[in-house]
Amino acid sequence: MIPSITIDSTKCVTDLCFLGQVYNTDKSPYNSIGHRHPYTAVYTLLMAQYKHNPIRFVEIGIAGGASVKLWNKFFEKGTFYFFDRDQNFLDHSAQNVSSVNNTFALMDVSIAESIRESLEKTGGSIDLLLDDSSHNATHQNLIIHEVIPFIRSGGMIIIEDISRDEPEETYFNMLKDIYFEFSFVSFIVTEHANRYSPGWNNDKLLVLIKK
């Protein structure tokens, strides 16, 4: 089975937490609009090594574009690739950041070929890939399987918004054929006094580090 870690970040406030509040992203428990996932303190723990260093960063699923601004502000030397199934989301976000280090392209996470073809635009050697797209377990499984060749050794995949109601065995069964590709795999159940995700109950991550 896939191990699980629970992190309560109520007493841990980071720069990324505040940036999440500033840009109104639901990744921060201090977001003032809509859902409040307690991810930003955990992300600081996982990503701080890249804050002042070059990073090749991919996010799948950008919706209104709050996280596009967040990552551009946090990673000072980042090269970014953002994907979504909605061209309007991509066009809107592209207006808010530099075209020099940001690439936007369509991707349909329900189709393996679309995932592969879109990721080919990155040139591979991805340091960190974050999925915030459909939150569908089948699609999340497709993403993990298809992104492996594009992730560098030691690179990280983070799947956001795993349903706490979904049996963890579901993910183990989907990933057991590629489990050997990773040096670390774990769920992270994220807790915070401000946690708020009514109707979803999906404050949970799946983190995978490639061998």
Which residues make up each language-model segment?
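A short alpha-helical cap/connector motif
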Residues: 1-130, 134-159, 163-211
